[in-house]
Curated annotation (Swiss-Prot):
The keyword Zinc-finger belongs to this UniProt entry's keyword annotation: yes
Alphabetic keyword roster: Host nucleus, Metal-binding, Repressor, Secreted, Signal, Transcription, Transcription regulation, Virulence, Zinc, Zinc-finger
A single MF term (Gene Ontology): RNA polymerase II core promoter sequence-specific DNA binding
Upregulating conditions: Expressed during multiple stages of host plant infection, including prepenetration, early biotrophy, late biotrophy, transition and necrotrophy.
ZnF segments: C2H2-type: 58-81
Subcellular location: Secreted; Host nucleus
Gene: HTR1
Name of protein: Host transcription reprogramming factor 1
Keyword Transport in record: no
Signal peptide: 1-19
InterPro entries: Znf_C2H2_type (IPR013087)
Function: Secreted effector that translocates into the nuclei of host cells to reprogram the expression of immunity-associated genes by binding to effector binding elements (EBEs) in rice. Binds the 5'-CAATCTTC-3' EBE of promoters from targeted rice genes and probably recruits a yet to be determined host repressor. Causes ambivalent immunity with increased susceptibility to the hemibiotrophic pathogens Magnaporthe oryzae and Xanthomonas oryzae pv. oryzae, but enhances resistance to Cochliobolus miyabeanus, a necrotrophic pathogen.
Length: 198
């Protein structure tokens, strides 16, 4: 384990040693004219690397995307968000233009529906909506009290010897056998008290 650590450190040192200083004027537009090493510190007597970016980011208020410059942020806003200002934007990350619009009235919504599906359906739906509003949004049907009463009146589900629920509406095989004519007498097993089902 120590040998592998030593080899990895040795490889890093070797890679650092191969990064030799660039010769003066070796590349066109070389900012290091005196042959300084890239990233050298000023304390070594060499000129520092010119800083292109100060490390701060500008975040988009809508989608929180980071940008290095204000110009890039403005271009992003124009392209992706339609150049909306921070005050004009709503909450959330959506970019849809319809979401920020005010809610349409019921009449406008029904008019739009009418153009799509036909006047008869919309008129009927409008009447139903009016009736629901008059009734206090209570849809026709059973009340909660009535539903609770029906649940209470349900018979208790019997369980058979295997732990499965026995359906009450379907007669057992023995009951079906008893319903046939001439089969109303007890079977020999039942006479002995053995509850064997047919």
């Amino acid at each position: 384990m120590q040998l592998s650590n030593f080899l990895s450190i040795w490889a890093l040192v070797a890679m650092g040693a191969t990064a030799a200083p660039m010769p003066s004027g070796s590349a066109p537009g070389n900012p290091f004219a005196d042959g300084e090493a890239y990233g050298a510190r000023p304390s070594q007597g060499l000129t520092p690397v010119p800083k292109v970016h100060d490390g701060s980011y500008h975040s988009c208020e809508t989608c929180a995307a980071p940008f290095r410059t204000e110009e890039r942020l403005a271009a992003h806003r124009q392209a992706d968000h339609g150049n909306q200002g921070a005050a004009a934007r709503g909450s959330g990350r959506h970019t849809s233009k319809n979401r920020g619009s005010s809610k349409t009235s019921e009449r406008e919504r029904l008019d739009r529906l009418a153009s799509r599906v036909g006047e008869d359906y919309v008129e009927k739906r409008s009447q139903e909506a009016t009736e629901e509003q008059e009734q206090g949004h209570v849809k026709p049907g059973r009340s909660k009290k009535e539903i609770a009463q029906r649940i209470r009146n349900l018979p208790v589900t019997p369980w058979n010897q295997y732990g499965a629920a026995v359906k009450l509406d379907k007669p057992t095989r023995k009951e079906q056998y008893r319903q046939l004519p001439g089969n109303d007498r007890l079977t020999p097993f039942e006479e002995q008290g053995d509850p064997v089902q047919l």
